[in-house]
């Protein structure tokens, strides 16, 4: 199922009982967060607050609050199908030339999908049905959520920030939180390694003193939103990947105030610029770690135009201790990562980012071990291959007889196959999440690798233990006898 815009997606969700309209007046100050948090933890529907207190614009929350809805947003019916999305990304990252006619025929569907990658530019678009500019620009018209009691101010959480570096043809889409600073000002909290920040750094070097054009789209179609959080190759625009997911080209329109292109069907678009050197202290905010983060300085985004659809919907979320919406999305996107990693490291059997580990700070990898030291090579590969794992603090590597997604299995492997001194890798002074207050200094910390694999002769002089396993003939005989033994009553079974 493909969706042309957010409203198309919401219509389907409502048909399937995956959207709940809330007509009671609910305050964007704290109340929406509490309702959304309770709903998400119960695996509940997306929420459309139709009457936010003090506003006429409805607020959409919990859109991707289940892995199933993330898969649906990517045009799939099941989370397991996201492996196919990962295979497509792996192909785009390092395409292999066809090895013959049969191979060419097998790859034709992928080549056909590539035809949907270029954007389609429109002369007019729904996102520009209403326009405010100059003195009429007022962010207080938008029911921006104030999520937690000690948050510094209301926070734009689901804005797709659109930028272009001075030496690049493609545009970058990234999701960066934005603190409301005034009627026409936001603080753009992007980390130095993210695409928007890199575009800005290059602009400052190429055009000293000149304003950096920026646009922020709110309420884009699900394919475009999810493309912005998917590990697309650096050479590929998120718009192009959204076209692949959607099955037709991403429709865009030129901004009114600059040359950036924004999603034509977006509910709201903020246009403006960053003045070089214009910085402001951002935070504190409750974040996906479950803590309030430190205050730090980030660029100020000055909004010159607000454009929107008639009867626009404001798309929002909150972040907090997992599970929250980013953690749920992490569970779904985990399936996308696996084929990408397997393309580079075929020995990887499974890869898991536990949501309770903030969906990126700890990874469990299972491999078909082939030589001594293999686990350490995989650790280094995980940390260096994709930018998304730059901030992964812990990598646990196990053999393929271990279920990476079962802590009972993983803990057993750690406690029986590891020597803490021999099998632990510690690396100091590596890039670390700025939100990680446990690191010695902001943005710089250490990483730990745990080799929980069975050790080969070159790795230990001792005889290695053999796992206990019952004789298969005995198991088969007891299987046949089990029901007759009636060890558990029906009452016990129900317990």
Swiss-Prot record:
Where's it mainly located? membrane
Q: Which reaction does it catalyse?
A: a 4-hydroxy-3-(all-trans-polyprenyl)benzoate + H(+) = a 2-(all-trans-polyprenyl)phenol + CO2
- Membrane-protein topology: Peripheral membrane protein
Q: Name one Pfam family in it.
A: UbiD
Q: Where is prenylated FMN annotated to bind?
A: 175-177, 189-191, 194-195
Output one GO MF annotation: 3-octaprenyl-4-hydroxybenzoate carboxy-lyase activity
Pathway it works in? Cofactor biosynthesis; ubiquinone biosynthesis
Keywords, ordered alphabetically: Cell membrane, Decarboxylase, Flavoprotein, FMN, Lyase, Manganese, Membrane, Metal-binding, Ubiquinone biosynthesis
GO terms of biological process kind: ubiquinone biosynthetic process
Which InterPro entries does the annotation name?
Answer: UbiD, UbiD-like_C, UbiD-like_N, UbiD_bacteria, UbiD_Rift_dom
Instruction: List localization entries.
Output: Cell membrane
- How many cofactor units bind, and how? Binds 1 prenylated FMN per subunit.
Q: Describe its assembly.
A: Homohexamer.
Its biological function?
Catalyzes the decarboxylation of 3-octaprenyl-4-hydroxy benzoate to 2-octaprenylphenol, an intermediate step in ubiquinone biosynthesis.
Tell me its family: Belongs to the UbiD family.
* This protein's name: 3-octaprenyl-4-hydroxybenzoate carboxy-lyase
Organism, as annotated? Yersinia pestis bv. Antiqua (strain Angola)
The protein's gene is named: ubiD
